[in-house]
Structures are given as C-alpha cells and as structure tokens.
Amino acid sequence: DIIIVDEASFVSTDSIEKIIEVYKSSAFMFVGDPGQIESIEFGNWFDLLLNLLKAKDVVFTLDVEYRTKVVELTKIWDEVRHGKKKNIIELLSAYEMTEEISDDIFKVQENEVVLCLNYDGLYGINNINRYLQASNPNDAFEYQQNLYKVGDPVVFITNDYSAYGIYNNLSGKIVGIKNEEENITFKIELLESVSYFGKLSNEIEIVEEGSGFYAIVTKMKYYNDKYDTDMDTRTKLPFQISYAMSIHKAQGLEFDSVKIVITKESDEQVTKNIFYTAVTRAKKNLKVYWQPEVADYVLGNIENSEESKTADLSILSEQLKKYI
C-alpha cells in the first residue's frame, strides 16, 4: 500500500507520528510546499525531512508553475523562498507591489481578497469586510445579526459535506437571496467544480446550471422550541463573508488579485512561511500594504529566521547521518 499525505507541511509532528505508527508497513508519499504555513501544533518535520533527504533520490520538485504566468510574481515568490531581505524589497518596489497603508485597501475588485493578520482594528478583517460589503450596491438581508448581499464573496467553514465537494475553505459568491417569512435561502456560485449533485441534507443542495455549479443553502429563521439545545447548529450558516480573511484561512486558495495588510500591531506575527503563503495566493496582481519600518522589521525577521534554520539543519544532519 502507498499512503499519500497531502498538505504535509500543515500536519503536526504528533499527527504524522500516529499516521506512521498505524500504517508502518506501508510506503509513504508526502506532498506539500515546505514554504507554506506550518502546523498550528508543534512540528516542521516536513521541511526538515526534505532537507535531510534531498540527496537520497526520494525528493522530487514540481517546478512547472500553474497558478500564474506573471513572471514578476514568480520572481517575488522565489526571493521570499530564499529569504533575502534586500532582494525581496527591491523586487516589490520595482514591480510596484508595495505601498504604504492607504484607503486604496478599501477599493474592491472582482475576484480579489484582502489578507490580514488580525480581526480587530481599522485594518482588521472584521472592519474591512464591513466596509467593502457596504460598497456593494445590492440590497442587504439580515440573518442572525449579520448582513448578506448578492455579490458578496464567501468561503465555506464546514467539512460536514467534504465527501460531496463542499469543504472547509471552498470559495464562492452569493448570486441569489430569497427572504421568506420562515426561511432564508442563499444561492451560491461555487468557484470549484463538484462531483455530486442533489440534496446533501435538508439545508444544502448542489445543482448544476449551464457550466456553473451552485450550492442552495436554506435556513429556518426561527426555532420556537426553547429546549432545542441544537439551535445554534440549526441556524448557523456553513459559510462566511470573505472580502477579507486571515492568511491562515487563505492557505490553499487563489485569487486574481491579492492585497496584504501588515500593520505595526501585527508585524511580530509574520513569519517567512506566513508571508510566503500570502504572496503566493495571487494569480495576477499583488500589493503589500505596510509602513517602511514594518517592512524593514518583517523582512529582517524573515532573513534572520532563514539563517537560523540553516544552522539548525547543519547540526541535525550531522546527528542523523548514522540513521539515514
């Protein structure tokens, strides 16, 4: 048997140890991008493994870029991978992909996302979502104290229907809202194809219309049973508005245009992996919004972390040579 572990960089050391223990008689294929965000729990085993085994003819790099044909973007990505502060800032400046924080952040475009580190504050996810939704001229419908409009971008936040193609982080756009006395129904255009059509539950149905795929989500507005302990689940929508989102949430997604906002309040959170994940979400346009001192701090940390990692790998390699 061959066990394939996808998004390997996101798997914790504890989890991969358990997987190997369960399937210890199997062969393993680990697939992922070591430059992207590491596991929330402890462990950067995937990155270490690649460096330790790269001379053993078991590491293969897929070097054909499918996300973008924009040469400037691929050059930026390469420089971030290498972690050289001077080269990164020079390219960002030369390609006009860096700018001081301004109101330009609040000018919305089609298939664009604003990536942030924090939820609160003027340039946090919550406020940017409110502001950009307010610029949507369509009528607003309130449900569970939140507003929704036709044209709002959304991202699904459930894995309950992953077997049918509706998975956590699936992107879509609201194209219809039917507001009735007892129910509210959302028609969401899915930005990825699905393999199943029909009712997934009493609340979600997948339909195909022309060349498009749509999720029809219906929720009851009210539950009269005060003893219904499952009421929150029954009324909670499986998606949320996504004009802006966290960089962690954006992992695995791609957009025509990406704006990254890094403020003084959040600069300490930006690791090399987080910054790399953010800039590689863009297919066509990229802009990083930060003050000069923030850019200097963030890119300095990225360069220092790369030097520290190189030293750690050298020590670890010497210790493990006798086992490999």
Regions found by a protein language model. Give the residues of each.
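Short, conserved loop/helix-junction motifs that constitute active-site signature segments
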Residues: E21-K24, L53-K54, T280-A282
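Walker B catalytic acidic pair
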Residues: D6-E7, G32
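Conserved helicase motor core of P-loop NTPases
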Residues: G35-E180, I184-K187, E192-G198, T218, ...
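Loop/turn-to-beta-strand initiation segments
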Residues: D1-I2, S25-M29, N285-K287
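Conserved nucleotide-binding/hydrolysis modules and their immediate coupling elements
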Residues: N138-Y276
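Helicase C-terminal subdomain and adjacent C-terminal extension
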Residues: L48-L49, S257-I324
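Catalytic P-loop NTPase motifs of RecA-like helicase/translocase cores
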Residues: F10-S12, I37-E38
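Short, conserved "post-DEAD/DEAH" coupling segment immediately C-terminal to helicase motif II
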Residues: T13-S26, L48
